[in-house]
Amino acid sequence: MSILNSGSCMMTDTNQNMECKVDFKKGEFDLQPLQINQFGFTKTQLHKPLTRNLSNKEDTHVPKRQKVSEPYFRGETERNVKSHQDRAASIYHEAMNGASGIHKQMSLPEYSPQMGNSWEIQVPMTTRHSISETPTKPFTATTAIAGSAGSLPRNTTIGLPGPSALLKHESGKNENQVRVCLYHKHYSRWYLPFDKDDDNQLVEAYAKYFSSENRPSIFYVLQGISFGPECEYVLRRKHWWNPWAEKVMRREIVERKIDTHPGCRTVAERYEQIEASGSEELLIIPIYKINMWVLSLLLFSAGGSVLIGLWMRLSDPSFAHGMLLNLGIGSIGSFLYLLSNTWCR
């Protein structure tokens, strides 16, 4: 059965496709088989791909673009979060599975100038539980310092976070545990809890492994970690553009309250407000020790600039006054620049 529509129709058969053409003058039907090639195009469409087939009536109506609704964006956000969680889980499982009985050798730099040679840390991350179980169960990590005499490997139990802990900040309940904040090249930051029995070498080893950088020198060495109420100790990157910042060493960590609330004139007022509200907003400020050659270089340059300015002031009073002021401001600015790159980082 065929249907007429504007002088053309299509007749479908089970064996072959037939093209139905109507001649209005003769009132007859002209049935011709469609010559379809292997790509699904007719002969007319193959020679003239940009012209439409006159045997078929095409709908030229273009529908309006639908307005993107808010649930669509919400769904996209949920999918992005899901993908990030999957990536975090894959890295976590890779770290755990990479550790099925395999000893990972981690070469670390010297921690003190008194040590004559560098030492290495072996971290055989042997899991005591499968990945399908709760990931917050601890596993045993062994550290062996090869460079120091008389040291023996010791076992340390550490509770590593699961994949969900890599993406969100969760407050801990263990008073003998500290959370170290690491920077990852795929994620903004993630946390690793360490107990008071863990030393700085183990912190540095895990910082190297979980950062996926294979360059432990980009992290500062944590010295003098005091394990008290849980707070964030951050392993910061070194400034690659500042050679003076590569020479500093972190000696201790001081806890200070954040003084950013409007209306607070002193840190003590902000501390009282935080204590009254019961919230814990802590800012970890690292204290650095400047090398003596850097400090002597700054003092020498500042003193030299002042002496040159005084000499120019005595030789030409009309000209050297502005030069002395510029040199003094420059020396003070250079000193403040060094302080900003060492203490205020």
Swiss-Prot record:
One of its GO terms (cellular component) is membrane. The keyword Disulfide bond does not apply. One of its GO terms (biological process) is meiotic cell cycle. It comes from the Eukaryota. It is a multi-pass membrane protein. Keywords: Chromosome partition, Meiosis, Membrane, Sporulation, Transmembrane, Transmembrane helix. The keyword Transmembrane applies. Its main location: membrane. It is found in: Membrane. The chain crosses the membrane at residues 292-312, 319-329. Required for correct meiotic chromosome segregation. Appears to also have role in sporulation. This is Meiotically up-regulated gene 97 protein. It comes from Schizosaccharomyces pombe (strain 972 / ATCC 24843) (Fission yeast). The lineage of its organism: Eukaryota, Fungi, Dikarya, Ascomycota, Taphrinomycotina. The gene is mug97.
